[in-house]
Regions:
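Cytosolic juxtamembrane amphipathic/interface segments immediately preceding
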Residues: 33-39, 170-175
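Membrane-interfacial segments
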Residues: 25-26, 30, 65-69, 93-101, ...
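Membrane-embedded catalytic scaffold of the fatty acid hydroxylase/desaturase
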Residues: 48, 76-191
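Juxtamembrane helix-loop boundaries in multi-pass membrane proteins
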Residues: 36-47, 139
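Alpha-helical bilayer-embedded segments of polytopic membrane proteins, i.e.
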Residues: 1-20, 42-64, 73-86, 179-219
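Membrane-helix interface/capping segments
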Residues: 20-36
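Internal transmembrane alpha-helix with an interfacial aromatic "cap," most often the third helix
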Residues: 58-65, 127-133
């Protein structure tokens, strides 16, 4: 059980504790240093290297859920641990979604595949950044709004926004929403392939873990 719930423990207990012990770091790079750092490929490689680690962890978790001795509780806890990893991957996707390269956009989608949150790749750079902190932005919380009020509004609203944005982009090019060039359909197809593969490897026993990890990562 302790191993299965390792993700939430690290994310919500150990890292915040270390953060408190280390304290605030007030040393920020200068504008000149930032320009040099942006040109250093090390940081881009560091971000991208998380994706194969993410997939290896998800595949291993599916292997564990396929074992007969793995209890339902352990499957749920494993799902939470994978949700913690795939939630971090949404941050990875965020960084890559702002790049101009189509390869980076594909990698952004791959990072979002386990969570199934692929519409984020479209909505965040083209919707949220355009309307941030305005009433029209589903990704900005309202004053006094609780987390549980904000969560369904942002998930549903961001999904609708992404569909509208991608539909408008395709329309400008004279293409149908159902075109093979639809980035949302491409991302959702990858998600379908991933989850079908995990079920094929682990069987129906993986359903609780896969469902929990997806929900937990988005939260």
């Amino acid at each position: 059980i302790l191993f299965a719930m390792g993700g939430p423990l690290v994310l919500h207990v150990i890292i915040p504790r270390i953060d408190t012990l280390v304290g605030a770091d007030n040393n920020n790079p200068s504008p000149e240093e930032i320009k040099l750092l942006e040109q250093d490929p090390y940081y881009a490689r560091l971000v991208k290297s998380f994706i194969p680690i993410q997939y290896a962890a998800n595949i291993y978790a599916c292997y564990l859920t396929a074992r007969k001795e793995t209890s339902l509780l352990d499957k749920v806890l494993l799902g939470m641990s994978m949700g913690a990893i795939n939630g971090i991957a949404i941050n990875t996707a965020h960084e890559l979604s702002h790049k101009a390269s189509s390869l980076d956009h594909l990698l952004s989608h791959l990072a979002l595949v386990p969570s199934g949150y692929n519409h984020f790749r479209v909505e965040h750079p083209y919707g949220h950044h355009k309307r941030a902190a305005t009433p029209e932005d589903p990704a900005s919380s309202k004053m006094g709004e609780t987390f549980y009020e904000f969560l369904p509004r942002t998930v549903i609203g961001s999904f609708k926004s992404a569909v509208e944005i991608e539909g408008a982009r395709l329309k400008r090019k004279g293409l149908s929403f159902w075109s093979k060039h639809n980035e949302l359909l491409q991302g959702w197809s990858l998600t379908g392939i991933f989850h079908s593969s995990m079920l094929g490897i682990s069987g129906r026993g993986a359903v609780p873990s896969l469902a929990v990890q997806s929900a937990y990562s988005i939260m």
